[in-house]
């Protein structure tokens, strides 16, 4: 009987070659249907990221102005301040108010974008999560800066009141802090009457200094009144979104911890892989594996 095994092998090779050639021709002709990897559908976030970056720059500028204003108020000493300095402080306060209102409106727009993204893309989409985390971080920083500005104004008010009380005590007139607050509240500053010069040993220079402090207090009171509505809006936002902001902050912190732990584990895995004796033995025995 004739051995036809070699003939069978040759025929098998010819069939395989013909199949490969047919597949190659079909690919060249575009007959095969292309299969693409379809990722999760997410809208383009470049516009949102650009707006967020611009808002972050505005908040950074706002923080710098508030900190600069606070440093200037720390230099308040027990001496008469010129009217030009009071006018400059008033101008800075107006600029801070304009910045704060602008940032507050921009944060409100971000909240609207978050709600819109939740409806269109879902609460777990990448864009929605980015907007939420960025809003939480920016709002928290804006809130802390506003509290710092409020504390700065309150501290300046206390310094002015203390100065007035101390100057009147030196002049021989006892005035309590409650009386000063009442005078400020009702606007009855009878301590500036000319009769005070005859009743006490206060000089015109001391009276002029007290009047300057009075102007500062009135100016500060007006600044607080101007920002009252803004503080109310911030407090309402904190009540409405406080829990969500806290949960977002917790999630971001936990994600950072998880990423750090993962990096450490990857580093240990690479180190253990290099020290694996079996791998070293295989590399020596199998040069082809070692080259890989």
Curated annotation (Swiss-Prot):
<comment type="subunit">
    <text>Interacts with EGFR.</text>
</comment>
<dbReference type="GO" id="GO:0016192">
    <property type="term" value="P:vesicle-mediated transport"/>
</dbReference>
<dbReference type="GO" id="GO:0005737">
    <property type="term" value="C:cytoplasm"/>
</dbReference>
<dbReference type="InterPro" id="IPR045242">
    <property type="entry name" value="Syntaxin"/>
</dbReference>
<dbReference type="InterPro" id="IPR006011">
    <property type="entry name" value="Syntaxin_N"/>
</dbReference>
<dbReference type="InterPro" id="IPR010989">
    <property type="entry name" value="SNARE"/>
</dbReference>
<comment type="function">
    <text>Plays a role in endosomal trafficking of the epidermal growth factor receptor (EGFR).</text>
</comment>
<dbReference type="InterPro" id="IPR000727">
    <property type="entry name" value="T_SNARE_dom"/>
</dbReference>
<comment type="similarity">
    <text>Belongs to the syntaxin family.</text>
</comment>
<dbReference type="Pfam" id="PF00804">
    <property type="entry name" value="Syntaxin"/>
</dbReference>
<protein>
    <recommendedName>
        <fullName>Syntaxin-19</fullName>
    </recommendedName>
</protein>
<feature type="domain" description="t-SNARE coiled-coil homology">
    <location>
        <begin position="207"/>
        <end position="269"/>
    </location>
</feature>
<keyword id="KW-0175">Coiled coil</keyword>
<dbReference type="GO" id="GO:0006886">
    <property type="term" value="P:intracellular protein transport"/>
</dbReference>
<keyword id="KW-0472">Membrane</keyword>
<dbReference type="GO" id="GO:0005886">
    <property type="term" value="C:plasma membrane"/>
</dbReference>
<keyword id="KW-1003">Cell membrane</keyword>
<dbReference type="InterPro" id="IPR006012">
    <property type="entry name" value="Syntaxin/epimorphin_CS"/>
</dbReference>
<keyword id="KW-0813">Transport</keyword>
<dbReference type="GO" id="GO:0005484">
    <property type="term" value="F:SNAP receptor activity"/>
</dbReference>
<keyword id="KW-0963">Cytoplasm</keyword>
């Amino acid at each position: 009987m004739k051995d036809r095994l070699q003939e069978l092998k040759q025929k098998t090779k010819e069939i395989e070659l013909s199949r490969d050639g047919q597949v190659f021709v079909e690919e060249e002709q575009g007959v095969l249907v292309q299969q693409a990897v379809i990722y999760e559908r997410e809208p383009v976030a470049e516009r949102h990221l650009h707006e967020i970056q611009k808002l972050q720059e505005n908040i950074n500028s706002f923080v710098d102005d508030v900190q600069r204003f606070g440093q200037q108020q720390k230099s308040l000493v027990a001496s008469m301040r010129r009217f030009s300095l009071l006018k400059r402080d008033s101008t800075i306060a107006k600029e801070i108010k304009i910045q704060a209102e602008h940032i507050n409106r921009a944060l409100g727009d971000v909240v609207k974008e978050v709600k819109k993204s939740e409806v269109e893309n879902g609460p777990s989409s990448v864009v929605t999560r980015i907007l939420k985390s960025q809003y939480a971080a920016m709002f928290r920083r804006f809130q802390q800066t506003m509290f710092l500005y409020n504390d700065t104004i309150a501290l300046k008010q206390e310094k002015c009141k203390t100065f007035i009380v101390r100057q009147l005590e030196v002049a021989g007139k006892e005035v309590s802090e409650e009386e000063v607050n009442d005078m400020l509240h009702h606007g009855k500053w009878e301590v500036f009457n000319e009769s005070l010069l005859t009743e006490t040993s206060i000089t015109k220079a001391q009276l002029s200094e007290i009047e300057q402090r009075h102007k500062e207090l009135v100016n500060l009171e007006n600044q607080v009144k101007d920002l009252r509505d803004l503080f109310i809006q911030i407090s309402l936002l904190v009540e409405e979104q406080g829990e969500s902001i806290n949960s977002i902050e917790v999630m971001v912190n936990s994600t950072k911890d998880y990423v750090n732990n993962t990096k450490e584990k990857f580093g240990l895995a690479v180190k253990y892989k290099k020290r694996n004796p079996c791998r070293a033995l295989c590399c020596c025995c199998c040069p082809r594996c070692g080259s890989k």
